[in-house]
Each structure stands twice: as structure tokens, then as C-alpha cells.
């Protein structure tokens, strides 16, 4: 809950005896301290043990948006500003999209949701035009034609949708937004 802050607080206050672990995205410690005015824990009281998985997000659009590539999206959105969904202000999907908009000069209206699931639901129903969402959640919808996959946020293509290029391959140089799911322990373990 609270973008990982509740779990992090629990681990920060736990005895460093090896019995308390935190599985959390790296965003809990890279983004949250910048977004939340008050954290009920000190990030330095928790240390990373290992990265469990590294992943990218996929830029996807509703099929009603007449785009098949990042170049199409750039041209279409400049002519007719679109809306994009995210899992909330400061969420990885929000920041990755803002990074894209900054790199390309594309104007879009942000529609923040209370988590990525309602954002994906409204994207699938066509209430918003596009979003950056976790690949394994949207890949089946891309394969079924319910969403159009435009680009991966990271440096590598996904094995789930190898036909979807990276953002760099799609013409956005130096773009890389990769995330990790981490295992953390209280300092002193």
C-alpha cells in the first residue's frame, strides 16, 4: 500500500535478524522520496539484497487511435492532443510517459488513476488514448488486437512481444526506462 511505503516502513522498523524481507520495485526508493513529502521510514535503514527481475514498460494505445508506430503517435498527438493514463501521479507509468513527452515534444493530457489496473481498464475501453504499462499485463491484449504496442521503455525488446521495438529503435534516442523488482532487508542483516 501507499506505493510500497507501508511495507518499507515495516521493514525499516524490523529487527535485523533475517526474518523480515521486503519485495518491492526500485521505485519505492528512487521515486517515492522525491514524490512523497513525508516518509515514515528512512530509506537508508533498508538495503537491497538482490534484483529479482528487471523489466520495461510498453507504450500502448487503444486501437481507435490511428497509430501503428511511435512516429505516427508523435504526428497524431501534435495535431490533436490525446490523453494518457497512469497508475497515479509519480507512478512509474506517469514518469516514463513524461520522459517520452519531454524527449519528443508531444503534448498529451495526463489522467492519473488509483493504480495501473483501473488505468488499463479505461485504456482497454477507449476512455483514454494510451499509456505506459507493465509488459506482461498488456502483451496478451496487444497479441489479441485490443491494444496497439508501439515501443518498449527499456533497451531490449520483450520476449513476450518481440515485434514491438524499443523506444530507441522507434526513433527516440537515448531513451531507457528500465525497472527492477528488488529484495530488501533491514540495515544490519
Name each region found by the language model:
Residues 27-29, 55-56, 65-66, 90-93, ...:
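Solvent-exposed loop/turn segments at secondary-structure junctions
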Residues 5-8, 29-34, 94:
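Adenylate-forming
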Amino acid at each position: 500500500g501507499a506505493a510500497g511505503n507501508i511495507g518499507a516502513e515495516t521493514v525499516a522498523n524490523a529487527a535485523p535478524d533475517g526474518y523480515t524481507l521486503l519485495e518491492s520495485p526500485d521505485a519505492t526508493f528512487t521515486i517515492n522520496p522525491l514524490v512523497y513529502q513525508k516518509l515514515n521510514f528512512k530509506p537508508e535503514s533498508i538495503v537491497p539484497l538482490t534484483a529479482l527481475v528487471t523489466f520495461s514498460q510498453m507504450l500502448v494505445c487503444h486501437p481507435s487511435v490511428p497509430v501503428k508506430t511511435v512516429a505516427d503517435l508523435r504526428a497524431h498527438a501534435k495535431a490533436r492532443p490525446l490523453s494518457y493514463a497512469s497508475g497515479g501521479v509519480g507512478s512509474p507509468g506517469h514518469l516514463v510517459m513524461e520522459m517520452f513527452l519531454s524527449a519528443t515534444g508531444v503534448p498529451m493530457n495526463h489522467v492519473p488513476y488509483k493504480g495501473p489496473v483501473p488505468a488499463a481498464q479505461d485504456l482497454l475501453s477507449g476512455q483514454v488514448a494510451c499509456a505506459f504499462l507493465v509488459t506482461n499485463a498488456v502483451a496478451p491484449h496487444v497479441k489479441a488486437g485490443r491494444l496497439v504496442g508501439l515501443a518498449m521503455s527499456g533497451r531490449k525488446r520483450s520476449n513476450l512481444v518481440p515485434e514491438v521495438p524499443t523506444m530507441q529503435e522507434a526513433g527516440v534516442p537515448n531513451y531507457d526506462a528500465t525497472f527492477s523488482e528488488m529484495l530488501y532487508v533491514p540495515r544490519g542483516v
